[in-house]
Amino acid sequence: LQIIKIIFRYYCQSEAETILNRFYIKEETAMQNIDLICVGKLNAKYFAEGVAEYQKRLAAFASFRIIELPEEKIEEKNASDAVVKKALDKEGKAILSNVRKGAAIVAMCIEGRQISSDELAQFLADRANSGAGDVAFVIGSSHGLSDEVKKAAALKFSMGRITMPHQLARLVLTEQIYRACTINAGMKYHK
């Protein structure tokens, strides 16, 4: 870390402290854990390849893992709200049982706040610098997320008012997490 500090100070003297304060954690602190907990599997090869590429790139910045949970089967074509709620509650319990202790939950949901890549970067940096750096991003099933998961969330995040397949949402979110990490590191990828 000392070598990195020297290099940053040499090449970016005026910005070095900002970058170091924003991204780098205390020297003794471990790498930030970022989890992506998803209900359902990636079926399309091209989505899986895209996610795998960003997952590989993220290894330079954080301990990043993806946890896939099974989607509850709903038999009825026009299922009642009670049937959907029961399925969401079961998925919600599985999601919450996979969140690391002390991790901030980021619930991906339509009613969430729309934030920029810079704001996401700042959220991750703030978590890392607070000493409680673990973050768990959560993408629910096609029916959404349980109320319990949404209530537990430190941030409810929306990718906008558009509707997209959850497999695509996973790829976009993984890219945005990578982009946020590059912003925090002062890299040029995000420009």
Regions of interest found by a model, annotated:
Residues M31-L58:
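N-terminal beta1-alpha1 ligand-phosphate binding loop
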Residues P70-V135:
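S-adenosyl-L-methionine/SAH cofactor-binding core of RNA-modifying enzymes
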Residues L42, I110-R113, S141-G144:
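Short glycine-rich anion-binding loops that position phosphate/pyrophosphate groups of nucleotides
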Residues H143, D147-K191:
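Structured adenosyl-cofactor binding patch, chiefly the S-adenosyl-L-methionine
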Residues A62, G102-A103, A153:
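Short, well-ordered alpha-helix to beta-strand connector turns
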Residues D35-I37, R65-I67, A136:
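A structural signal for isolated positions on well-ordered beta-strands in alpha/beta enzyme cores
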Residues Y10-A30:
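Short, Lys/Arg-enriched N-terminal segments with co-localized hydrophobic residues
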Residues A60-I74:
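A short beta-strand-loop structural module common to alpha/beta enzyme folds
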